[in-house]
Amino acid sequence: MPPALLALAISAFGIGTTEFVIMGLLPEVSADLDISIPVAGTLVSGYALGVVVGAPILALAATRVNRRRALVGLMLLFVAGNLLSAVAPTYAVLMSGRIVAALCHGAFFGIGSVLAADLVAVERRASAIALMFSGLTLANVLGVPFGTALGQHFGWRSTFWAVTVLGLMSLAGLLAFVPAEAVRARETVRSQLVPLRRLDVWLALATTVLGFGGLFASFTYVAPMMTDVAGFSAGAVTWLLVLFGAGLCAGNAIGGRFADRSPATTLVVLLLLLTAVLTVFRFTAAGPAGAAITLFLLGVIGFATVPGLQMRVIEEAGGSTTLAAAVNIAAFNLGNAIGAYLGGLVIDAGFGYAAPNLAGAALAAGGLALASVGAARRARSSPIRLAAADA
């Protein structure tokens, strides 16, 4: 394994921890800042929207910058945002810190995923991307559960202090392992914009928004769902997040392996399974055993889609991939925001903490429809692409 892939995974661990840990701390943040659970849930949406804004702007700004320097600069921004969150006395300041930290997210994963794909043979690109994203899955297995436990025992601000330190450790990993001569982005700003004129790229981006939105409509409210519906204690949430994170690890590895072989078909099958699991979760959430099992399956299937979703955009973008890859990270987080918002709406409407699962199933079904259309279009165009390659 190239050492640079390890550095990317370490950084992904830090970013993933700060993105997801807030979900396990919604009750603590809500009580401390005197806001409702749905309002606290907007801290998830705010982070996601920060990614959406920051991804294209910072990816374009990094066009002519050495990739190592770009990644280090983005990680410094991440540290600053988490430091602001750690000292935040109010909801508004906390939201500001979340947004600052989020600005680097899309560009980091966009540049990082393209670099990861460039470091290995063509037939291993999806697996290399999956390896980078394994940092996100490990964040859910280790960072999020223990960050949640830390926040429950010492206050939620202590979690953000810990994440700030984690960001500094990630920065050290980048400086140590990513070579100073890391390939410069070869695209001009103009060439990076070309893929965004293609219908298939936008179809892939929309699939990401809806598919991942389905996952986060449910997962955003996992803490109150597990305590108020399934009957778990607040302390059990930490171990439920470990269980979910274990599912993410398994799903990420499985998704990368199958996406290497047949990305389009794999994506369709996984989105079909995601729709089914979310639908079932609405009913299994009523009991502890069913809720725990379904939460694990949600992690497996939800994150198994990630390598295929990112690889599909890179393939459709052709030669100029950095901006398209970054925009797809923004699409993941736009899906997060939409999912969290819709989940909050159904809770506010009085349908209960299990109802967001059905909202998520509807979003995942939309992603399934778009993935099916995209797979059909790619199958029709494959002979043309092969002929062009042979010409």
Q: For the regions a protein language model found, what residue spans apply to each?
A:
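Helix-breaking motifs and short loop linkers at transmembrane-helix boundaries and internal kinks
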Residues: 34, 66, 87-93, 231, ...
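Cytoplasmic helix-loop-helix junction between adjacent transmembrane helices
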Residues: 97-135
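A late C-terminal transmembrane helix in Major Facilitator Superfamily
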Residues: 316-353, 360
